[in-house]
Amino acid sequence: VTKKKKAHTAKNMKNKAEIIKFYQDIDWVDLLDKSDELNKAFQWIDKIIEEGIFRPAVLTTVNSLGEMIAKTNYVRSKNNQISIICVPSGIEKNKVVNAFNAILVDDYSGNLLNWSKAGGISIKYGYDKDYVSINSLGYFVSKGISKKLELALQ
């Protein structure tokens, strides 16, 4: 291993530690409560569950126990029936649940790439030219998603 590679790895590890520390220090209760996007998402999740076509679950990465507790309490305050699966940072989501033929909606492209490689269907929340992209979970209500999925599976 070259000195340059060791220095690069050390820098990445320092950055990763700083990122994890950043996420550990966030006031998750306040952040989640103030997120209009998340609150709107749960309005759609309720409709998706009601229709019975999909069985949604919350699959979320966590960096600390405090974040996990805050996210769990938040989700439970919005919907007490949905499954919540917390994935420790550094572990791929497809290693925790079976991705095969399952749909993952995620804003992080790295998760989507791993999910696709594991046989799952990846949908970008936001925009990414490499994935079917959505900006609302409303696409999963009725037949909104079917056209986008047809395009993705061609």
Predicted regions and their residues:
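Active-site neighborhood of HAD-like aspartate-dependent phosphohydrolases
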Residues: 1-29, 117-118
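Substrate-recognition "cap/lid" segment bordering the active-site pocket of phosphatases
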Residues: 59-102, 109-112
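A structural signal for short, well-ordered beta-strand segments and their strand-loop junctions
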Residues: 58, 104-105, 123-124
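Short, acidic loop-to-helix structural element flanking the phosphoryl-transfer center
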Residues: 24-58, 65-69
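N-terminal cationic-hydrophobic initiation segments that often serve targeting/anchoring roles
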Residues: 49-50, 76, 116
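Asp-based, Mg2+/Mn2+-dependent phosphohydrolase catalytic module
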Residues: 79, 95-98, 108-154
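A structural signal for well-ordered alpha-helical scaffolds and beta->alpha junctions
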Residues: 38-42, 68-72, 108, 142, ...
